[in-house]
Amino acid sequence: MFNFLKRDNGKVISINGIDSLLGKINLIDVREIYEYRNGSLKTARNIPMGNLLNNPDRYLKEEDEYYLMCQTGSRSSLACRRLTKEGFNVINVRGGIGAYKGAKRK
């Protein structure tokens, strides 16, 4: 149903699978505030990666599921690996906002 891929570094969703989920998921943009202000997905909450990793319990609940994105998917992938090790249910949005802006939207 959803375009998930399982990798050694955790769960990943293709940018093509995100449109139908917007508004139904906990989407976190881990870019810095200045990057986020230059454009993000309208339902994304901005929590810079450093803040999120330094204090995940402040922002996340272990029983909930979160989708993490950044500009290219690299930072969010790193964050997902660490948060998964800490017991959080996170999914990396592969390609990030850069791929989203570059992809044809339906």
Protein language model regions, located:
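Rhodanese-like catalytic fold shared by cysteine-dependent sulfurtransferases
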Residues: 1-16, 21-25, 33-65, 74-106
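Short, surface-exposed ligand- or partner-binding patches at beta-edge/loop junctions that are enriched
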Residues: 69
